[in-house]
Curated annotation (Swiss-Prot):
Belongs to the CsrA/RsmA family. Homodimer; the beta-strands of each monomer intercalate to form a hydrophobic core, while the alpha-helices form wings that extend away from the core. InterPro entries: CsrA (IPR003751), CsrA_sf (IPR036107). PANTHER family: CARBON STORAGE REGULATOR (PTHR34984:SF1). This is Translational regulator CsrA. A translational regulator that binds mRNA to regulate translation initiation and/or mRNA stability. Usually binds in the 5'-UTR at or near the Shine-Dalgarno sequence preventing ribosome-binding, thus repressing translation. Its main target seems to be the major flagellin gene, while its function is anatagonized by FliW.
């Protein structure tokens, strides 16, 4: 893991397309501004993990539905 120190108003560049700017530091919270192309999804980590869990559940449900439909058409 790369660890960098930045002050309010300073930025970090990731590749050619993503810029993170420190907007404010308030106690133990850091407010970030993110400039990135629209096609790049940006989520808080807990939201990203919840989306991954829901996608995994949905794909399992789709597999089950396919099996049920196959059983019905085979009968």
């Amino acid at each position: 893991m790369l660890v960098l120190k930045r002050k309010t108003g300073e930025a970090i560049q990731i590749g050619d397309d993503i810029e993170l700017t420190i907007l404010a530091i308030e106690g133990d919270q850091v407010k970030l501004g993110i400039h990135a192309p629209r096609q790049i999804d940006i989520h808080r980590k807990e939201i990203y993990l919840a989306i991954q869990d829901e996608n995994a559940e949905a794909s399992q449900s789709t597999g089950l539905m396919s099996q049920l439909l196959k059983q019905r058409t085979d009968s």
